[in-house]
Structures are given as C-alpha cells and as structure tokens.
C-alpha cells in the first residue's frame, strides 16, 4: 500500500497484520481521490476526518495532497499502532489527531470538517449510522463533503444528506454525500 499523490507520493504505508481492518485498495483510493478532487479542486488547508481509519491511508492521502489537519478515528489497537507509525515515518504527526476508540463513541466535534471519510466494515451500515451521529454532534458543516465506502450492494442513506455521486470499484461502492 502506497501514497498515491502529493508530497509523499510513492511512500509505503504499513497495514495491521490482523483481519480486523480492510485496507482500501490503491485502485479504489485513486478513484475516490479523483472524485474528491473534481469536487473540491484543491485539498490545501482542508480539515479532514478519517473515520474507521485503519492504517490511516485515506487521511494520509489527504494530508499528502495539502490538507491542513486530519482527525483519525479507529478502535483496533494494531491498526492504531500502524497508523501512528505511518504518521511518524512521514513527519505528519503534528498535523494529525488520533482518536482511539469506537467512531460511534466520539464526542462533540472539535470543529466542523471540510471532508469526512468513512470506511466502515462492509455490510454493517456503520458508516451511515456514524455519519448521522457525528452530524448531530457538529462534525459536519453546511459545505462538508462526505465519502462512505461500502460493499457494492449495501444501501447508503442518511437523513438530511443528498447523494452527490456513486461509483463502483470492484466489490466496493464509493458514495459521496453533501448536507441537503
């Protein structure tokens, strides 16, 4: 697994050795960031939340492309260890905040985020549930862009959000949403 673009392009990322997380494939990540770039233009100075972060590949990709800061939410201990090692190896720790624990247990937002990336376990609906909860806790702003990666046939519906785009990549489905 590697960073696709930006300051850290080509740098390898560690992934946890257990089966508790599912790293986003490079092809899926490349498709997602192409979709995001066409809507956001630049990632410069964005505040990003990478939720169900695993090794942090999505948030690190955003930081590599110029995002100002990323909050990472992850509960698996091995994934958190890999994430922290990745941030340290890239010198990205000062622009990151790692929240250990369930994404569903995150409290009120430290701020609203420009971009929220949800990569929950497939088939659980946890991405939609977490978005609904974090929206009520102030994580989502009026102009936020949200990405939920899910299984190809999994429904992604969240009250108060409109679907901006859907793209299928292999067995994954990428859904972009905005506040309605």
List the predicted regions and their residue ranges:
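Class I S-adenosyl-L-methionine-dependent methyltransferase catalytic core
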Residues: 1-180
């Amino acid at each position: 697994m590697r960073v696709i673009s930006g300051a850290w392009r080509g740098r390898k990322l560690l992934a946890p050795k257990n089966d508790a997380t599912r790293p986003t494939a490079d092809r899926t990540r490349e498709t997602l960031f192409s979709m995001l770039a066409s809507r956001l233009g630049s990632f410069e100075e964005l505040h990003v939340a990478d939720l169900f972060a695993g090794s942090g590949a999505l948030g690190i990709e955003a930081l590599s492309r110029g995002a100002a800061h990323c909050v990472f939410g992850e509960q698996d201990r091995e994934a958190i260890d890999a994430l922290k090692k990745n941030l340290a190896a890239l010198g990205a720790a000062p622009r990151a905040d790692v929240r250990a624990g369930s994404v569903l247990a995150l409290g009120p937002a430290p701020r609203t985020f420009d971009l929220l990336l949800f990569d929950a376990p497939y088939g659980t609906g946890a991405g939609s549930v977490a978005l609904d909860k974090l929206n009520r806790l102030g994580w989502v702003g009026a102009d936020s862009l949200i990405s939920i990666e899910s299984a190809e046939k999994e429904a992604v519906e969240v009250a108060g959000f409109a679907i901006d785009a859907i793209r299928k990549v292999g067995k994954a489905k990428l859904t972009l949403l905005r506040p309605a």
